[in-house]
Amino acid sequence: TNKWKDKIKIDENFVVTNPKEKIIIIYNHGSDGNDVKLKDCFWRSELRNMAQLAGDKINGKEIMVYIHCQGQLEGDLGAKLGKVGMWMKKWEGPYPGTSKMDRRVEGNLEVIKKFVKMGVPKKQIFMSGHSCGGWATLRLTAKYMEEVGGGISLMPACFWNLSKKYKVK
C-alpha cells in the first residue's frame, strides 16, 4: 500500500511539541557520488520503511522521522577533482582536508544537538541511514555514541570504487 505517503510532511521550520514524549529517527540517504555535490537529496524508495514508523508510538512516545538531506555537501577533493577523479588508480591518499563523509557525520551531530536543545532527551534520538547514510550512521555512533540513543544502519556501504580497487568482498 501507499499509506506511508500520507505520513510525509515537509516542514523546514518545524518545532517539536512535547519533546520529552517524542522519539526522533534522523534518516540519512545513500549517495551515488563519492565526494561531490549531488542534485538529489534522497530516493523515495528508501523512505518507505522509515516513513511507515512516523506517528507510531512506543511506550506512549510518538516517533518522528527527520529526513536529513546532505546532497549539497562536498569534500575538499571532490570540489577539486570531480566525481571520479579521486578514485583513479594513481590516487593513493591519505585524504587531504575534510571529506564529504566527515562533513556528513559532523552535520548529523549538529542536527542531534538541535533536537537536544529543543528538549528531546539524547536517549530518544536515533541516527539511521541506508548505504552511505548507513556508513555515516556507523561513523557517528562510533565517534559520538554518548550523544545519541543508538544507530540503525541499513546496508552500510560507500565508495564502491575503493572496495573494488582493494578487492574487498
Residue ranges and their predicted role:
Residues 35, 74-77, 157-164:
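A short beta-to-alpha transition loop/helix N-cap that caps and shapes the active-site region
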